[in-house]
Amino acid sequence: MCALWRSCIYNCRDCAIKGKETGNIRRRLGPQIPHIKSCAPSSILFSSCSKIEKILTFAAMEIVVSGIRSTGNLHLGNYYGAIQNFVKMQHEYNCFFFIADLHSLTTHPTPASLHTNVKSVLIEYLAAGIDPEKATIYVQSDVPEIAELYLYLNMNAYLGELERSTSFKDKVRANPENVNAGLLTYPVLMAADILIHKATKVPVGKDQEQHLEMARTFGNRFNRLYNNEYFPEPYAFNFSNSLVKIPGLDGKGKMGKSEGEGNAIFLGDAPEVIRKKVMRAVTDSGPTVENQQKPDEIQNLFDLMKVVSTQDTYDHFNNLYNTCQVRYGDLKKQLAEDMIIATAPIRDRINAIAADTSYLSKVAKMGAEKARESASRTIKDVREIIGFRSF
């Protein structure tokens, strides 16, 4: 009998593996270990110790959680700022990547647009390289345990700290007629997204770091209130130094779905659409002094070129700018063609995946089951800790 068999982490009526010689692996790895029964059929567990080793290795991985709001199609900012790193993370971590449709409700989408946007993000996750066999991809609303934990955490989240959230204040200023409770408690729902899987690593941008700090606060507050060190502390994690901020084409800030169609290059944009958007990008009359500082709208174009073009191409146009010889029309044409080339593989996969509705349904169902397996363990524990117990 092999060592893995002797140190089986479970010895219960639900598992295929039985025996008296249970080891200390579960105590060492704690609640991060998924239930083996749901990971592999009993025939595999009895016939292949290498499969057991694979399951235990997966269980020992640190947990990563992140998601993107389903408010429209994904763009270059989403890809280079987040998804590109998601694809790398899935090979080394136990990753949960979700489609944040509950978060999108603060903007009151129609039922039709809500469903369409969720489907689009799912398609684009897959087309961009997230593998449902390596990472758990799920729709937030398919995991009701998240909303339940959100409720419990809300009981210990206070008005003052929620009102001090920078993103809440920004939303109030931008849209004062739509100051709803969902906006106010957005950080609590984000905390529930993270804590439901007991994640320790969360890929976030600078604009979300305050929310992540609040998630730590809510988790630690729960632990103190019930005198139980249950929730681990989650921290920002972006896998490598390759995380970049992608500027929009309007020259006013980062690329975003809410900034208008002309601001963003979407992953599924057709070549002619990309060319039209880039050619409309804001520019000035050109440099008049050698090596002068680039204004924001011009720097944005060069920042985009740094991401999608070759180093030689970037250096060529940068030199033309520094010597006052740049022609913005030529720069934009080159940038557009490089964007078309960069997005071509993803665009092709988007079209192929979108046509396979049975595959999409299978991925969504499988992801929901895997996410709920993790979430239900947490909620069961949380109910017990709070005091919701059967008679």
Language model features with spans:
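Internal, conserved structured core segments that host functional sites
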Residues: D170-Y226, P247
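Short, positively charged low-complexity motifs
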Residues: N24, R28, H35-K37, S42
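N-terminal Rossmann-like or analogous alpha/beta NTP/dinucleotide-binding catalytic cores
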Residues: E62-A192, R347, N351
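Conserved nucleotide- and phosphate/pyrophosphate-binding catalytic cores
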Residues: N78, Q210, R216-F391
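Charged/polar low-complexity intrinsically disordered segments
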Residues: K20-E21, Q32, K51-K54
